[in-house]
Amino acid sequence: MSAPAPEATIGTLPSLLGATREELGDALAAIGVPEREIRMRTAQVWHWIYFHGIRSFDTMLNVGKGLRTTLAAHYSLERPQVVSEQVSVDGTRKWLIRLPPVDAQDRGAEVECVYIPESDRGTLCISSQVGCTLTCSFCHTGTQKLVRNLSAREIVSQLVVAREKLGDFPGLVPPKDGLLPTEGNRPITNIVFMGMGEPLYNFDNVRKAVSVLSDGEGLSLSRRRITVSTAGVVPQMEALGREAGSMLAVSLHAVRDDLRDKLVPLNKKYPIKTLLEACRTYPGASNARRITFEYVMLKDINDSPAEARELIRLLKGIPAKINLIPFNPWPGAPYDCSDWDRIERFSDIVFNAGYASPVRTPRGRDILAACGQLKSETEKLRARARLLGED
């Protein structure tokens, strides 16, 4: 179900961007930094990479010139390439990011990353895989085959790239177009692993990435503001809560196994009862750290009042909130979005039972950046490569 994730690129110096503290310390030891200085030097370099967002080792003013020169001779701070940036009429931004090649056969995989600004927050939706194995029938990403896992460094680099584009490092200027939060001083306040891929099929790299994203001396995002979404990879859920400490979101979308088998085929392996048992024992779940259940509203498929009442019954005893997601269309999609009055009635039933049931406002539909619409250009690149190979 998973694919290996790379750490270094071919033909270039390895990038330290995205490295954990341990990996950064190992990199410094490998170029001759004395053991007694490793901890101090790691803290210095870490601060420059993740707090200041530097692109060159030469800008590390409190690090000696000799070490800066040695670092530059052996490592880089290379970022992925932003192939395109689209800005929606509602201020949502979507970046197509091309990752450096990892071997001679790799032509540069691509992922999509989405920024959703609101008045009081800015949410970055990041990817954990190139493509996906799950083939959820309502999701555009599910129509793209899995290419490979992203490394922890590639996951972290999505936030670094986004912060650069939004002027969110010292000395950078925010963009003039689009929207940014008007309350507070941080354009990116939340991260959701709801982009391309199933995060729990890339658990080790997601866990490592969360440790970098949440480090208080660098990128400094609270783990309570990092949400990992899963379609229900039950064996990894407990470990996610215990080792990553992030918030959990579950892509539920149905209250009957026969329907969920079609919408989320993973349900055949981990049916609803098994999934909800794992939610009940999720480490740290409480009224202050509720599990989010995502429920896409599909016209005449899963949107009846009876299904709303069954959802309430299923979630009894779980600290939960339910995000109702109007279906976002994509080319060739086999579903339609529920009528608005149907969505509101469903929401009212759930809310009156004591569960928060916000209806997610569709964002970025005009640039295919909304929930369920992401699909990279990697497949097109591979198709072109095959055609070139046949010439």
Swiss-Prot record:
UniProt remark on cofactor binding: Binds 1 [4Fe-4S] cluster. The cluster is coordinated with 3 cysteines and an exchangeable S-adenosyl-L-methionine.
Co-factor(s): [4Fe-4S] cluster
Record-linked InterPro entries: Aldolase_TIM (IPR013785), Methyltransferase_A (IPR040072), RlmN_N (IPR048641), RNA_MTrfase_RlmN (IPR027492), rRNA_lsu_MTrfase_RlmN/Cfr (IPR004383), rSAM (IPR007197)
Cystine bridges: 125-371
Gene Ontology annotations for the cellular component aspect, listed alphabetically: cytoplasm
Keywords: 4Fe-4S, Cytoplasm, Disulfide bond, Iron, Iron-sulfur, Metal-binding, Methyltransferase, rRNA processing, S-adenosyl-L-methionine, Transferase, tRNA processing
Residues holding [4Fe-4S] cluster: 132, 136, 139
Enzyme Commission number: 2.1.1.192
A Pfam family per the record: RlmN_N
Chief location bin: cytoplasm
Residues of the active site: 112, 371
Catalytic activity, reaction form: adenosine(2503) in 23S rRNA + 2 reduced [2Fe-2S]-[ferredoxin] + 2 S-adenosyl-L-methionine = 2-methyladenosine(2503) in 23S rRNA + 5'-deoxyadenosine + L-methionine + 2 oxidized [2Fe-2S]-[ferredoxin] + S-adenosyl-L-homocysteine; adenosine(37) in tRNA + 2 reduced [2Fe-2S]-[ferredoxin] + 2 S-adenosyl-L-methionine = 2-methyladenosine(37) in tRNA + 5'-deoxyadenosine + L-methionine + 2 oxidized [2Fe-2S]-[ferredoxin] + S-adenosyl-L-homocysteine
Gene3D superfamilies: 1.10.150.530, Aldolase class I
Subcellular location: Cytoplasm
Domain Radical SAM core as annotated: residue spans: 118-368
GO molecular function term, any single one: 4 iron, 4 sulfur cluster binding
Binding positions for S-adenosyl-L-methionine per the UniProt entry: 197-198, 229, 251-253, 328
NCBIfam families hit by this protein: rRNA_mod_RlmN
Family: Belongs to the radical SAM superfamily. RlmN family.
Something else known: Reaction proceeds by a ping-pong mechanism involving intermediate methylation of a conserved cysteine residue.
Protein name according to UniProt: Dual-specificity RNA methyltransferase RlmN
Lineage: Bacteria, Pseudomonadati, Pseudomonadota, Alphaproteobacteria, Hyphomicrobiales
